[in-house]
Amino acid sequence: SYTGESGGTPRYVASPDINTEDFCAAVDFLSTHDDVDPERIGIIGICGWGGMALNAATIDTRIKATVTSTMYDMSRVNANGYFDSMNADQRHELRRQLNEQRTIDTKNGSYALTGGVVDPLPDDVPWFVKDYHNYYKTDRGYHKRSLNSNGGWNKTSALSFINMPLRSEERRV
């Protein structure tokens, strides 16, 4: 709804609820076409949208096949940090900082962005950050309007993922 070539506002927002609904809305659209077999609708979630695809498949019984590719569990990383490194006190401090940022954003009338994928890349980053860089910051995946290639997501998007474990019901798919 608020990324890529969509026209939605506010821009640069990731939301487990809204982005899950985007998948379900696509199924709504497809299921109304005579040339689509409603019993053969599938979805694919790439990178951070893998968790949203699994969440959509958990709630929408019309989805008959679900694929995730290079899945990145945004809810887990936002709640627990990379490698589950964040404790309860650190998580509370993160929430405090992000809510302070909401106030700043409201006063400014615009969202502060996270900055996208780190560039230049430090030597000691985890392998998956190197993979992000190798994709989003090179000709292979760079795009001038890509969030990850450039300014990144709005900083406060992380709040909605902290208490939303997207993969908690995936066994129901």
Task: Report the location of each language-model feature.
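Hydrophobic, aromatic-rich cap/lid helix
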Residues: 137-166
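Alpha/beta-hydrolase-fold enzymes
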Residues: 54-139
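Catalytic nucleophile-loop/oxyanion-hole region of alpha/beta-hydrolase
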Residues: 3-38
